[in-house]
Swiss-Prot record:
Entry superkingdom: Bacteria
Assigned GO CC terms: cytoplasm; ribonuclease H2 complex
Protein name: Ribonuclease HII
Location in the cell: Cytoplasm
Record keywords, A-Z: Cytoplasm, Endonuclease, Hydrolase, Manganese, Metal-binding, Nuclease
């Protein structure tokens, strides 16, 4: 039975979207592994190869949607959408991690992005697509250096928030304890 791998990117950042990708490989691709263990250049090369040689879908949630529904609900909605999309393919669906976020129709596996090539491919799809969005946001909001930090809470990013406040892609529901009282939404 073929496998559909699912992984996400953008669960922990202070800013930007959440991307959840599902992928069925139609051809073997060399060099697949967890996206975090690949250079940005290598991820970009593999991303292009994956989209040419797979059936895939990427579900995206904006910072505003994450604030409105909550991260867990967005994950549940995204996982359900991917399960529905891939159901006709009669595949075994594996999601990286140990939580189903209330969704059904798939298995979870810790470190699946290291163990299962389809999950590695999904990891790359989610990461590269999200990183591209963050590079575009860097042009619109240059003070935050989103091209470099991808919205994560680096020291420079937190200092930029302290200096310039939050921008429209910051997750209002992700309060930084040491910034409370300094900044208001």
């Amino acid at each position: 039975m073929k496998i559909c791998g699912i992984d996400e990117a953008g669960r922990g950042p202070l800013a930007g979207p959440l991307h959840i990708a599902g992928c069925i490989l139609n051809k073997q691709i060399e060099g697949l592994k967890d996206s975090k263990k690949l250079s940005e250049k290598r991820r970009e090369i593999l991303y292009e190869e994956i989209i040419k040689n797979s059936t895939y879908k990427i579900v995206k949630f904006s910072a505003a949607q994450i604030d409105k529904f909550g991260l867990s609900k967005c994950l549940k909605l995204g996982l359900n959408e991917l399960v529905d999309f891939f159901a006709p393919f009669e595949v075994k669906i594996i999601f990286d991690g140990n939580s189903k976020f209330g969704a059904e129709g798939f298995e979870t596996m810790v470190k699946a992005d290291d163990k299962i090539k389809e999950v590695s491919a999904a990891s790359i799809l989610a990461k590269v697509s999200r990183d591209r969005v963050m590079r575009n946001f860097d042009i619109k909001f240059p003070f935050y250096d989103f091209a470099k930090n991808k919205g994560y809470g680096s020291k420079a990013h937190i200092e930029a928030i302290q200096k310039y406040g939050y921008c429209e892609i910051h997750r209002k529901s992700f309060h930084l304890k040491h910034l409370q009282g300094i900044l208001e939404f």
